[in-house]
Design a protein with these regions (language model features):
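Active-site catalytic microenvironments for nucleophilic, acid-base chemistry
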Residues: 27-34, 64-71, 95-96, 120-128, ...
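P-loop NTPase Walker
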Residues: 1-104, 108, 236
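ATP-hydrolysis module of ASCE/P-loop NTPase motor domains
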Residues: 76, 99-200
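Short acidic/histidine-centered micro-motifs embedded in hydrophobic/aromatic stretches
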Residues: 88, 140, 166, 223-224, ...
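Conserved helicase NTPase motor core
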Residues: 1-21, 49, 81, 110-114, ...
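Short helix/loop segment immediately N-terminal to the Walker
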Residues: 32-43, 132-148, 230, 234-241
Length: 288
């Protein structure tokens, strides 16, 4: 009986959430068509936006919604859009890429390609700053055997892992390399030495991404949030385009992903979140 508003639904695996969300999407499309709210508004065609995590889920939702619409006598493929969260962010960023110094034809690196590029940034850092520099970042009480392993070559893998985790967190909190470097100026000497190291690697990594040009998955959400916060006209257009947002696997949404969806739904307030709180990896998902 949902017709609008914010709603959280707890759904354990096997409870039929895909079927239910697909049926709801079809109902909302029919509702918009009946009310003629799907007609162009300010040059924007209105759609129900369904966001999920995997491409396979996108295909599944698309097929089910199309089936429900056909049964209602409506044309499939009109009045809704099914995207992964990163696919949605890509749509947002491409629409305003040039205003943020990005090539509108940027490539998107998957996790494997991004990790390979990050490893190159680490190797560049090591070549520029000398491997011995890392010695300063190792705790004095570290076991001698581990220290030898780190400095004999394995340390590049360790640094890449640490840098990847920190960079991902930085982007989740919308912190650029420049912002981190600027904040570190308040802490002279050896304070936050590990963060200084990662900041240098982060800067090199972003420079490499721009040279392609390319964005990684975290960049997509980083820029999507920035654009929506700083461009109210564009945000208004997107809010007109997507008056309803249905979110699948909400328990897996990161802080910045939740922020982007909150910005998109702030005006209309029509946001349905479906997830399993028992599998939540953060605190952004709460049940109704």
């Amino acid at each position: 009986k949902y017709t609008g508003g914010t709603m959280g639904i707890s759904a354990v695996p096997g409870s039929g959430k895909t079927h239910t969300l697909s049926a709801l999407a079809a109902k909302l499309v029919e509702q918009m068509m009946t009310n003629k709210t799907s007609n162009p508004f300010n040059g924007t065609e209105r759609e129900v936006l369904i966001v999920t995590f995997s491409n396979s889920a996108v295909s599944n939702f698309s097929a089910r919604i199309a089936k429900f619409l056909s049964e209602k006598g409506l044309v499939p493929g009109i009045g809704y859009r099914v995207r992964t969260l990163h696919g949605m962010a890509t749509d947002i960023v491409r629409g305003r890429a040039e205003g943020y110094g990005l090539d509108p034809d940027f490539n998107i690196l998957d996790e494997t390609a991004a990790n390979m590029l990050l490893r190159r940034a680490v190797e560049q850092w090591a070549a520029d700053d000398n491997a011995a520099t890392f010695n300063r970042y190792i705790k004095k009480d570290i076991k001698e055997e581990k220290q030898k392993g780190i400095l004999s070559g394995k340390w590049l893998d360790d640094i890449t892992t640490v840098a990847g985790s920190v960079i991902s967190q930085a982007k989740d909190y919308q912190l650029s390399p420049e912002m981190i470097a600027d904040r570190l100026k308040s802490f002279p000497g050896e304070d936050f030495s590990l963060l200084r190291m990662v900041s240098s690697i982060y800067s090199r990594y972003q420079t490499m991404l721009r040279s392609y040009p390319a964005l990684d998955f975290a960049d997509l959400m980083f820029y999507a949030a920035q654009i929506l916060e700083n461009d109210p006209v564009y945000l208004n257009i997107l809010q007109d385009r997507w008056p309803f947002i249905l979110e699948d696997e909400a328990q897996d949404s990161s802080l910045i992903q939740e922020k982007v969806l909150r910005l998109l739904t702030k005006r209309n307030g029509n946001w349905v979140r479906v997830g399993d709180p028992n599998q939540a990896i953060n605190e952004t998902f709460t049940t109704a």
